[in-house]
A protein has these predicted regions:
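Metalloprotease/metallohydrolase-associated module, dominated by Zn2+-dependent proteases
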Residues: 2-42, 48-49, 57-63, 86-161
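Active-site recognition of the HExxH zinc-binding catalytic motif
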Residues: 67-80
């Protein structure tokens, strides 16, 4: 089953996307991550394409949340580092590699949440990560990595609280 995430025209969002990309790249540099160039159009296409899992997070959700935009920039950057083109079918065509990029992005996102001391966000995303273990599309070889992320950030949350 595939689902297409909510669509808002590129023209309506391009300026906002550009501003948010700039802000996220600064945040990522502070976290020690050197992102690949991500154009506003690539970001838009990636965020509005179909997903095999029925993802319900929309481009608006991401633009409204600094943690999610950091996540998506890392995810797209990691895919580009693997030589994967970013377009409206990337997630469907390369979904096993997307999971690898997704986990790297999750680590940066949650490091940023720890840095910001946003423990509520950490709890939300740790719960999301638990559900990823039940995802039928998750490649089996990535289950240990998902568990390691859960362990690391659950322990980090306990230390901070």
């Amino acid at each position: 089953m595939t689902s297409s995430r909510t669509r808002v025209s590129y023209a309506a969002l391009s300026k906002r996307i550009n501003e948010k990309l700039r802000d996220a790249i600064k945040i990522l540099k502070e976290l020690g991550y050197e992102s690949q160039h991500v154009s506003p159009k690539e970001f838009y296409d990636y965020m509005t394409e179909e997903t095999p899992t029925g993802d319900t997070i929309t481009i608006i959700d991401v633009l409204d949340n600094d943690f999610l935009i950091v996540h998506e920039i890392v995810e797209i950057s990691e895919l580009k580092k693997m030589g994967i083109p970013i377009h409206r079918r990337t997630i469907i065509m390369f979904h096993p590699k997307v999971y690898e990029a997704h986990f790297t992005a999750t680590e940066y996102e949650l490091d940023y949440a720890l840095d910001k001391k946003d423990y509520d966000w950490l709890r939300v995303r740790i719960n999301h990560a638990k559900s990823w273990l039940e995802d039928d599309y998750l490649p089996k070889h990535l289950v240990p990595r998902c568990r390691a992320i859960l362990k690391r950030f659950s322990e980090g949350l306990l230390k901070e609280e």
